[in-house]
Amino acid sequence: MPIPTFVQAARFATNEFRFRQIYQKYKTHTMIDPALYVGNLHLAKRVANVEGAVIECGTWRGGMIAGIADVLGPERHYYLCDSFEGLPAAEQVDGANAKKYEVDPTNPWYHNNCTASEDEAREAMAKSTAKNVSIVKGWFENTLATLPQEPIALLRLDGDWYSSTKCALETLADRVVSRGMILIDDYYFWEGCTMAVNEYAAQKKWPIQQLGKICYITIP
């Protein structure tokens, strides 16, 4: 029997209120705008009954994955992957706006080229419910292939550029289990990220889905 619409609405409202509270808890540890942050949590909740790790590629201060941990609970393994040295150089494939961004420290989203410290990420995770946390420092091409070969329930990509996004997809996407999810932060913002996702999804014949301004892929 279908769930009555009013029950669905009440459940959504309850989650929305809770997720906004989670945003307030971590807002100093994330660059993501409140609506997008809450949207990420709504999507993350869809994998609540899917077993596997949570991996974030491009974690900055850890505020997004910490919020996800509060939604998905303490029993999973959470991996925070970042250079903690800022973004690598943008390439031609990333587009003119990306090249302009990386030389413009007046941009409100610049944050020293997206540089954060491991301690800031640990601080965010210490406030979360997560018990099993791994901080993985280094460039994706040097670190992602070294992660333990465990199933992934949720893979979140926030690497901005083509090469970073492509590396994460080629290295980790095949380990995302059925009904698991890939969330892509920059799909509607950076050309290179869009291209990397489109290429990989086409190769796999995976439909690209959208919730507001959030791009995601649900693994068949």
Can you say where each PLM-predicted feature lies in the sequence?
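A short alpha-helical cap/connector motif
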Residues: M1-P220
